[in-house]
Regions:
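Active-site mouth of glycoside hydrolases
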Residues: 1-113
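Conserved acidic residues
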Residues: 21, 117, 202
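Active-site beta-loop-alpha junctions enriched in small/polar residues
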Residues: 25-28, 96-98, 124-126, 178, ...
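Short catalytic/ligand-binding loop motif for oxyanion handling, primarily in non-cytosolic enzymes
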Residues: 30-34, 100-102, 127-130, 182-184, ...
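Charged, glycine/proline-rich intrinsically disordered loops and linkers
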Residues: 41-55, 137-153, 242
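Glycoside hydrolase catalytic-domain groove-lining segments
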Residues: 65, 69-72, 76, 80, ...
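Substrate-binding cleft of secreted/luminal carbohydrate-active enzymes
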Residues: 182-242
Length: 242
């Protein structure tokens, strides 16, 4: 229904809308762990049925195989729905935050084997330095040196290094989403742009530009405004040319 709905401004269906570049199926998806699924009777029954039908044991290793197939089949099913609706934009599967591969390699294998043309990740240097809930615990990280952070996760396959593995040569890479996270400096956007290019990223989207009307009342993270953060805005323009 979303794909066949008409854009009120252009009169074009979203499936045919030329200003939509990609379809990301789920933003920051998560999946049950083997421990989690045992507390969900319906989902656990599905796994047990799969295990019995495939000669597998009821254990963590077998569940990883089940989850790998589940992720692949879900992506492929959604991919087919999108194509049947007439949309031709690349389909993207999000691999969430850095370190998400740690403990979840089966999810990555499932997406890799799927029909999705692209995979995505998030990039928020400094997020680990602020307690959750982030909005209730703001912290000025402008003077923070992130060089070690970027270097640490570039080659780490459980960080961002998985994006440069040979098996991902057939997948486009994108970033959704990124921000400088409580950092109002002018240097981070250009560094992020160079970092993404080094990882083979072809498209990156920030979350989110702050609208003019409420920008004077907003601050901290997810904050970019030409009038209220001119230094960041200038660096964003520079990053666009990197």
């Amino acid at each position: 229904q979303l794909l066949t709905r008409k854009n009120n401004y252009s009169g074009t269906t979203y499936a045919a809308e030329k200003h939509i570049a990609l379809w990301e199926l789920i933003n920051e998806p998560e999946a049950f762990s083997y421990t989690d699924i045992q507390s969900n009777p319906a989902a656990y029954a599905d796994f047990q049925s799969w295990a019995a039908g495939n000669g597998q044991q009821d254990n963590d290793a077998s569940y990883a195989l089940f989850r790998q197939e589940l992720i692949r089949d879900y992506i492929d099913g959604m991919y087919d729905v999108i194509r049947e609706a007439g949309a031709q934009q690349p389909v993207v599967w999000s691999h969430n935050w850095h370190r998400y591969r740690n403990g979840n390699p089966d999810i990555f294998k499932g997406a890799l084997a799927s029909k999705a043309e692209a995979v995505a990740c998030c990039n928020y240097p400094g997020q680990d330095l602020v307690p959750q809930n982030y909005w209730s615990n703001p912290k000025d990280l402008t003077s923070q040196d992130y060089s070690g952070w970027f270097n640490q996760y570039f080659d780490d396959v459980n960080g961002y290094g998985w994006m440069t593995l040979p098996e991902y040569a057939g997948k486009a890479k994108t970033v959704y989403e990124f921000e400088t996270f409580f950092n109002q400096s002018a240097y981070l956007y250009p560094i992020q742009a160079q970092y993404f290019r080094a990882l083979g990223v072809q498209c990156a989207s920030m979350w989110t530009y702050t609208m003019q009307e409420y920008a004077p009342y907003h601050c901290g993270s997810h904050f970019l405004s030409l009038t209220c953060t001119p230094k960041k805005a200038a660096s964003f323009i520079v990053a666009g040319g990197k």
